[in-house]
A protein has these predicted regions:
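Loop/turn positions that initiate beta-strands
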Residues: 443-446, 450-451
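Short, solvent-exposed secondary-structure boundary/capping segments
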Residues: 461-478
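Extended, highly charged accessory segments
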Residues: 352-355, 359-418, 478-479, 483-825
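Short amphipathic alpha-helical interface segments
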Residues: 334-346, 417-426, 818-825
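A contiguous, basic/glycine-rich beta-loop/short-helix subdomain that forms a polymer-engagement track
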Residues: 125, 169-170, 174-179, 384-439
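Helicase motor core with emphasis on the C-terminal RecA-like subdomain
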Residues: 2-396
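Short beta-strand-centered aromatic/proline hotspots
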Residues: 453-460
Length: 825
């Protein structure tokens, strides 16, 4: 009796997919199977309560929702197996921490232990994830399947040709971009089905629209999380059925959603992390004995060297370690609320005994529990009534706030707001900026690129960002930067190591071609592409100038900037940039703007500092004790928009701020003042230091600098910028992303036209009610008619075919509320 197997997946789309795949087996083996998530209809939920399935497929959030329910708790008592799919997606996030606590609550309900099975394609530290899966002090077995033997990778750095110049003018773009598109198109035409992964939604939209402007009938579509469900399902089916040859996608298709057989995976630009590359390329060759094939198309020298390093590491299975969040307080508060819902009186030691068995909370203390309960007790309305003398938490008399908090915060995924960008001169909308971008850069005076043009933020009001166009793009930040995946410390250092090898071998008298050939034996790329990616390095060495490496930081002046070349990755460089910016601001009294990428830091000097002074500052930082570095960085961090964003996310998860509260309307000072000394403040700081900054490696490189293991050199260039600096300057001046306004207008018109023509809608006849079909807008005739009765009375809905079948059966009469709502669309 009751549910025997609980199958937990990170995505609703995976639930739908699993249901389709398991249905046949379950029907033939007489096993009851059901899916439950946020969109499950009331009728289906009632059916599950009356007659529980043997296997329940669900998400972590829905498990949270059913744990307090009296009837479902009875059904959960029969559980013998819990399967967690795509476990790597959970382990390094707060969703995973929350799930690990929920599984401890589930053990309380079941009254005995059950077997947990975790499934994942790519894990950097299997032992850690295994412990995360089963909890502390429980036995676990790891079954490894080697991936490298079954994977073939190649890095390509396309060179523009005369054909690309012609194509560039047709597509209103640059020859370099046209060359990349041409290579991708050739790959798509040579294969049956391809997944084309990008790192951000913005880039996937641009790529898909460029293909459609090139050829509206080209069988490629787009797939990402922001698309309507119907468009996503139509794209998945199109690839599965062979109507499409390729899908441009983001991480939405990284996980195991079934899109049929994939011959090849193309990664547009460096995947930035080894695990991501393996996960993405692993989507191809999904048959026993088949090889997974992947091609990485790169855009510049940094991108190519980075992709080469990541590809080599993937083939050698040198994956990034999984970082499990350290006893997050927000997940703990939510799970304590879940316990209080079912038990009127809870002693601190009871909470401690239950939750310390979960791996992220292995070193949980009574003080941690007290800190979280103090907030729950002191807030209004209370989430718990706590006696700190007796060390006991009681359910509050009025439980409305407790229920609202628990069921309103089932998800640990932060609600990211979006901001409308408005041109102040014409009051017309320009585009959208996300919360991540606004947190780090959303201040008046910031220059950024959106829709191919540079703009300057004038002021932010509510959810609108008022801007005006500017002529000089130097220092402008691309609007999609908030979405970018951080490059790990180890990857960036290996890029620096390649540059040091080239320098060493050239000093020994070797020719660049010979060096490129040697590197081609180590890295999966052609000699010619490797040689092109080393152009700037070779040029700098030929000028008798030192190049930045894994063991050398170089500093130089360029126009209004000081450039610090540091091969230490995104999070270490961000921490170093923040530290430099803060110390310089304290010294000069001016706000110093800093930008960073995985290989360099740009300090906008405004004439107040030089490369010589930056070198002195770096040496001063290297001489600081570790505790002083941490304290200085903490002081710097709490003043940033990044910290404000994390603080708001944590406060929302604690129920301290309503989900709709506007990010920009809350002053950072008042926020910090409100939460200082609370569990919310501590957790926000912890999250910032885990997700946004890499303090461990920052301290390591400063120590190596002090010990002389890393050298620090000034480059003399008369302010012109060294060859390697040019790569960063190209990015910071955004030359390749700028498009003249008149060409931009043509691009937007053509892109919108192509996108609308490729939308898929459900067409249904409201006369005979016997016809429903998913049709691409482009394929509709000028005068569409019902093929069954010839009527012109056709309705067009943004829904799936299946969801309209019940309406068809009823001939549009005696509809339920949800069916009427659907028809009114």
């Amino acid at each position: 009796l009751g549910i025997k197997v609980l199958y937990i997946t990170p995505l609703r789309a995976l639930n739908r997919d699993l249901l389709e795949r398991l249905q046949w087996w379950c029907n033939n083996l007489d096993i009851k199977l059901a899916v439950r998530h946020g969109d499950t209809e009331t009728r289906e939920r009632t059916r599950q309560a009356r007659s529980p399935p043997d296997i329940l497929i669900t998400t972590p959030e829905t498990l949270q929702a059913i744990l307090p329910g009296w009837i479902m708790r009875q059904h959960l008592r029969g559980i013998r197996w819990v399967i967690i799919d795509e476990v790597h997606e959970m382990a390094d996030s707060k969703r995973g921490s929350q799930l690990s606590l929920a599984l401890e609550r589930l053990r309380l309900i079941v009254g005995r232990d059950f077997q947990i099975i975790g499934l994942s394609a790519t894990i950097g530290t299997p032992e850690k994830v295994a412990k995360f899966l089963v909890g502390n002090d429980r036995e676990v077995e790891i079954v490894r399947v080697p991936v490298a033997r079954h994977m073939k990778l190649k890095v390509m750095f396309p060179q523009p040709t005369s054909i690309d110049n012609e194509l560039a003018s047709r597509l209103y773009t640059h020859p370099e971009v046209a060359a990349r598109l041409r290579i991708i198109r050739e790959l798509i035409e040579k294969h049956q089905s391809i997944l084309l992964f990008t790192n951000t939604r913005a880039i996937s939209e641009v790529l898909a629209s460029r293909f459609k402007v090139w050829d509206v009938d080209f069988p490629v579509s787009i797939h990402h999380g922001s698309l309507a469900k119907t468009s996503r399902i139509a794209a998945e089916r199109g690839l599965k059925d062979g109507a499409l040859k390729g899908l441009v996608c983001t991480s939405s298709l990284e996980l195991g959603i079934d899109v049929g057989r994939i011959d090849l995976v193309v990664q547009y630009m460096s995947p930035r992390q080894v695990t991501r590359l393996i996960q993405r390329v692993g989507r191809s060759g999904h048959r026993i004995g088949r090889i997974a094939k992947g091609v990485i198309i790169t855009m510049d020298s940094d991108d190519t060297l980075e992709a080469m390093v990541i590809a080599r590491r993937a083939l050698k299975e040198e994956l990034e370690p999984v970082i499990v969040p350290h006893k997050p307080y927000d997940a703990l508060a939510h799970q304590i609320a879940g316990l209080i819902l079912k038990k009127r009186r809870l002693y601190f030691y009871e909470i401690y005994d239950i939750f310390r068995k979960a791996y992220p909370y292995a070193d949980l203390t009574i003080e941690d529990i007290e800190k979280v309960l103090r907030y729950m007790h002191e807030r209004f309305p209370r989430l718990a009534w706590v006696s700190f003398e007796d060390m006991v938490a009681l359910k509050p008399r009025r439980t409305k706030a407790l229920f609202e908090y628990y069921f309103g915060n089932l998800s640990m995924i932060p609600d990211e707001k979006q901001y409308l960008v408005v041109d102040e001169t014409s009051d017309s909308p320009v585009g959208i900026l996300d919360e991540a971008f606004m947190a780090e850069y959303g201040k008046p005076g910031t220059k950024f690129i959106i829709r191919g043009s540079p703009w300057k933020i004038i002021h932010v009001y509510g959810e609108k960002v008022y801007v005006k166009p500017v002529d000089d793009p130097t220092g402008a930040i691309p609007s999609w930067i908030g979405e970018e995946i951080p490059v790990p410390f180890e990857v960036a250092r290996e890029v620096g190591w390649i540059r040091s090898v080239v320098e060493e071998k050239m000093k020994q008298g070797k020719k660049p071609e010979e060096i490129a050939l040697e590197l081609a034996h180590e890295y999966p790329a052609d000699k010619e592409d490797i040689l092109r990616s080393l152009n700037e390095t070779i040029e700098q060495i030929s000028r008798k100038q030192p190049v930045p490496t894994d063991k050398r930081i170089t500093v130089e002046d360029w126009e209004d900037f000081v450039i610090i070349h540091a091969h230490f990755g995104s999070l270490t460089n961000r921490a170093l940039a923040q530290l430099i910016g803060h110390v310089l601001s304290e010294q000069t009294g001016y706000t110093v703007a800093v930008q960073h990428d995985p290989y360099r830091i740009f300090v906008q000097t405004m004439g107040i500092t030089t490369s010589k002074e930056i070198i002195e500052l770096l040496n001063k930082l290297a001489g600081m004790p570790e505790i002083t570095i941490r304290e200085t960085l903490t002081r710097a961090t709490v003043k940033t928009g990044l910290f404000k964003r994390r603080l708001i996310h944590v406060a929302r998860r604690f129920g301290a701020i309503k989900k709709w509260v506007d990010f920009s309307s809350v002053s950072l000072k008042s926020l910090v003042k409100s939460f200082e000394g609370t569990a919310i403040y501590d957790e926000a700081l912890k999250e910032t230091f885990t997700k946004d900054l890499d303090v461990k490696h920052l301290i390591q490189i400063l120590r190596e600098l002090k010990e002389g293991k890393i050298e620090l050199l000034k480059l003399e260039n008369e302010g012109k910028g060294s060859p390697i600096a040019r790569i960063g300057i190209e990015r910071v001046s955004m030359k390749t992303d700028l498009i003249p306004p008149e060409r931009m207008r043509l691009i937007l018109i053509e892109s919108a036209k192509a996108r609308l023509l490729n939308e898929v809608r459900a067409i249904t006849c409201v006369d005979c009610w016997n016809y429903v079909e998913m049709v691409r807008i482009k394929d509709l005739p000028d005068n569409p008619k019902c093929p069954r009765c010839g009527s012109n009375a056709l309705g067009i809905l943004e829904e799936e075919e299946e969801s309209l079948l019940s309406i068809m059966e009823k001939k549009g009469e005696k509809l339920t509320k949800s069916e009427k709502k659907l028809m009114d669309k």
